[in-house]
Amino acid sequence: MKTLVLSIALALIAATGHAEDVTARSGGPSESAMLARNSEAAPDGMAFFRPVLSGVLYRSGFKGGDKGRTGMSGAQRTELCESGFSTAFYADFGKNTEFGRTSCGSGSLNYAAARSSRPSDVMKTVYDTIKDAGKGPVLVHCMWGVHSSGALSAMALVQFCGWSETRAKAYWNEARNGAPCGDSCDAWIDAKFDRFEVNPALKITDAERAAICPK
């Protein structure tokens, strides 16, 4: 009987832990989590699913890439929705993607296009999520999960956590897992940051920063 009770308890933890893991604003992700190859919270078929700001911002891509540029499947959107996400952005590559809202038992997920060279919409959405403790996290993904999603994530770390551009670019470089960038990876990320400026209107409190930012 004791074994049966333990098995049921573990099953309940597994069933509920997914949502709790992605929505908890628990003091900022560890470096190892930010650079992990993937996470147990990743929807099936997605890769490099990593926290950026605890309970607020995650990043990812697709296993094998998204060569058709069709974006997340209905099942992936529903899985994100059920786990507590409120918003997802496809950065740069979603030309054949049908964006829109997905409803689920726990709420809804809005799926929209984004550009790593025009980050203001993503930053504003992340800010609104930080300010609303009841709002589920944002996922920003790209084709592979290394370049464009990483650039927007690095910008968010500068905007909300006070990171220097140098530190943020170093994070982007390490998190791309050696993926090529054409002629120069430094030139690629520099060009993205040339289009980014910290927005003073999106300032957050020290307490909010302590709850979500990596140390």
What is the meaning of each model-derived region?
Residues 5-13:
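Bacterial N-terminal signal peptides
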Residues 18-140, 144, 151-215:
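Cys-dependent protein tyrosine phosphatase-like superfamily
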